[in-house]
Amino acid sequence: MVLVGCHVSIAGSIDRAVGRALDAGCDTFQIFSRNPRGWKVKDLDPGLAGAFRAAVSASGIGPVVDHMPYLPNPASPDAEIYEKSVAALAGELRRCSLLGIPYLVTHLGHHRGAGMEAGQERVVAAINRAFEDAGESDVMLLLENTAGEKNSVGTTVDNLSRIVDGIDAKERVGICFDTCHAFAAGYDLRTAEGVDAVLGEIDDAIDLSRLRVVHLNDCKGDLGSGLDRHEHIGLGRIGEDGFRHILRHPAVRRLPLICETPVDERRSDTGNIAKVRELAGA
């Protein structure tokens, strides 16, 4: 049995996301807790937060995963963007606490030509400040690996390890592993040996106990292309055999699996969830 779900909309009211997750056949699901394309955010209404928590509890599905909005860039050398990014991260941690969401996934941003080391140092400082500003919390911040786009931070396991090492409250940080991003960054997930290799590297450098969520996406780009273009499960360059190897690895089978696959006529979210269960042998 695997826990698999997808990203669902909060349109209309955040508690409606739970019904959408149930309709899609989710065992677990991911949301943006607010508009992901803007900086401004309204305070979370306590009544709505309570309704969301009640709906999740009644549904029997979970854990719920929240994803940071698109604009924050905690690696940015631009002072204004950086400060807004720290504030956004602290604010989202507080929102997760109110909503009872245990995991917040964040991208690590782009260093804008300042260099990987400088970018990593900014990310570490941003996370340390955000944790302090947000206050004590059971919410775990999950660092997501990136696809290897120009100037991106967090592409390699070594990048992620160096960031984790610099964080003061290490018990509050984990990893979200995105299969599309890993493949685009050069990690070959098409074979059992390739899957074993990258998970072994994570275990050696970071510890598999920090791996808490998998973003399960096929990849439109070739191995090492740096192309962050998600594809339906089994229809991209990783392929069905690759996902069989991924899904049958014991370190993956125990985790919440979130599909962030395209919205088009070829396959629905429900179809991707069914395909994951098929390939997992569940």
UniProtKB/Swiss-Prot annotation:
Alphabetized GO MF terms: deoxyribonuclease IV (phage-T4-induced) activity; DNA binding; DNA-(apurinic or apyrimidinic site) endonuclease activity; phosphoric diester hydrolase activity; zinc ion binding
Residues bound to Zn(2+) 1: H67, H107, E144
Entries under HAMAP family matching the protein: Nfo (MF_00152)
A Gene Ontology BP annotation from the UniProt entry: base-excision repair
Pfam families hit by this protein: AP_endonuc_2
Binding site for Zn(2+) 2: E144, D178, H215, E260
UniProt lineage: Archaea, Methanobacteriati, Methanobacteriota, Stenosarchaea group, Methanomicrobia
Binding site for Zn(2+) 3: H181, D228, H230
SUPFAM superfamilies: Xylose isomerase-like
Catalytic activity: Endonucleolytic cleavage to 5'-phosphooligonucleotide end-products
General function of this protein: Endonuclease IV plays a role in DNA repair. It cleaves phosphodiester bonds at apurinic or apyrimidinic (AP) sites, generating a 3'-hydroxyl group and a 5'-terminal sugar phosphate.
UniProt remark on cofactor binding: Binds 3 Zn(2+) ions.
UniProt KW keywords: DNA damage, DNA repair, Endonuclease, Hydrolase, Metal-binding, Nuclease, Zinc
Cofactor annotation: Zn(2+)
Enzyme Commission (EC) number: 3.1.21.2
InterPro entries: AP_endonuc_2, AP_endonuc_F2_Zn_BS, Xyl_isomerase-like_sf, Xyl_isomerase-like_TIM-brl
Name this polypeptide is given: Probable endonuclease 4
Family: Belongs to the AP endonuclease 2 family.
